[in-house]
């Protein structure tokens, strides 16, 4: 439940403490609840009109739909991850508008190739933002079912006033998907103390309800681009997501 709320907040609306990007634990189940957003009703639309087949549930007391009659491709939009005996799946989330555009194009021309559909859906769309670095392995993921998404945090530089003097700073605005912000800041601090990462005068987390803001103040005459590249190389500010597009098709697992 917590994982769903953190990933797909535009489809569901959680009430209560669902944890944080710093790794804080969520509240106990009895203190959290979720309601569907308006668009999520389209996943259940026309369920009462015999649009999908029903089968007995686990104890044969009720009938349940084999699949939901969704008007949108939920699996691609939400993404999915899980482990079973001898197999695993790891499907990244995608942009709602892009997937719907691709779906409409496929309805108009069912012979469209994966390459054609990638004109509408270039890459995954992760809820924490960030930048996707390179598309070749993403294309491989779409074409073969296996690939890798290299993600980078989004940064910019600012000139800050410090005791009457100006000092350049690197500001981290967005993080790669599933990266813990507190552990990232801790990792940067360790590298600075060990002198594996030099040129940093101060490090602080100014994040609040308005968004992420990690400030890395530089020493005088340091090159911000060089330090940014070191951050990508040495810390989780650059991370990857392994694509393994396995889903159940007609009741059997299939590499998509």
What are these regions (language model features)?
Residues 144-160:
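Eukaryotic nuclear low-complexity, Arg/Ser/Gly/Pro-rich intrinsically disordered regions
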Residues 6, 54, 155-157, 200:
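Generic preference for hydrophobic/aromatic residues in regular secondary structure cores
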Residues 69-108, 157-185, 189-256:
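Feature marking long nucleic-acid-engaging regions of large polymerase/nuclease enzymes
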Residues 3-148, 213-215:
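Catalytic phosphate-handling regions of large nucleic-acid enzymes and associated NTPases
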Residues 2-3, 231:
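Hydrophobic/aromatic pocket-lining and membrane-interface residues
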